[in-house]
Amino acid sequence: DGTDFLFSPVSTRFPTGKKRTEDPIADLIVNDYESFVNSGALFSKNVALIKSYTNLTKEEQVGSDEVVAERFINHMVDNLLYIYDSVPESTRELSKQWYEGANKIVQRMADKHGISLAQASAVAANLSPQKDWYQNASLAERVMNIYHENINDSFDQNMKDKADVIYFNKDVKPPARITNREKLDLIQGKSLQQLIDEKVSPHVLGMWVRTWDQTYNSPNYRIVSPDGKFLEYAVNKDGKTRSRAGWGSLAEIGKALTAVMNPEIEVLSESLGDANKVRNFYNNIFDPASTLGFVTIDTHAVAAALIRPLGGKAEEVGANFGTQKGSSNSKVTGHRGTYSLYEEAYRRAAKEKGVLPREMQSITWEAVRGLFTSTYKAQKQNVTFVQGVWNQYNKGKLSLAEARKKINDHSGGVERPSWERSDFTI
């Protein structure tokens, strides 16, 4: 169809099944809500999950799948607009720039190492699961730096000692220790370049990079501003000690390395996998100006749409990613879980405010992190309180406005973002 794929985003659904009717590499598949509604049993199974959510009243939970899904989307749109309006305009003007800032940061990394923006964007996206952007940006920088600057370093005794601490500590279960030992045996004494030449699996390369990083780099990372500036170091809840960046899985690091090593869009697209969130995140970073409606639904995006203090293990979050028991995914269409419902809510809310869906997402993402801070979420009674408010709403004892006010008053309202409180830049 004449699309220039060198400057193209990637398909947001990645169907791989034999019966698929779309090719996510040859064509650009941009998920739309209609395709989700028309997905048959997949749609019904995912709507069955939301029929139990107390964000809907008992009356709203009853009805056909399409009707209940529509009510759920309308509820989320209402919540997102409420959060959007609760953020001062001066903050909104900055927080809507998150992906433009991410694009600048990733472009700087790409320029430094002579790789494409697409490669650097894929590195960041592949390292994004369960990470905030501050850590994510730091991890992406580490992978690119180590690959380009330390590729010929050999796996020395310092790294071996560090590997023993990382991969064989008391928290590592016996089966994982066995596979870790197998990987480590392949790595002993070798450089990253030697391992690449030996065509070892990306997981093994990931282990080498993580071990080098934890041996020779500081674990501290900086706060980032929405417009792409690095600010002071992130600190822990005590306000003094510096936070430490935590690596995700070796599979994720391996995928990031695959992206660093291969400029071909087919390889990059495949490295991103079938998670709708990771694929949208890549597009938002790679081309923040796109009008195709790409929107990254992560843990905080689900929390904002539902106005709930959710963590990565919450059922609603798992359902969004298609990892929660009872959620439904399809290799034939590439739909995963309830993602399409949230995506549609953000698109509709954005349209009402005349902003891009990714701008609606980053404004409300920042706000919900300030409404439910990590300190607030860490206390079980707070999570229980909010659950109780939605239970009352579900039973018709509170209006939506009353429920939101109760939650807002209890949490103390939206705390200003860390980058807005900072007067430090590098």
Label the predicted regions.
Residues 5-426:
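HhH-family (HhH-GPD) DNA N-glycosylase catalytic core used in base-excision repair
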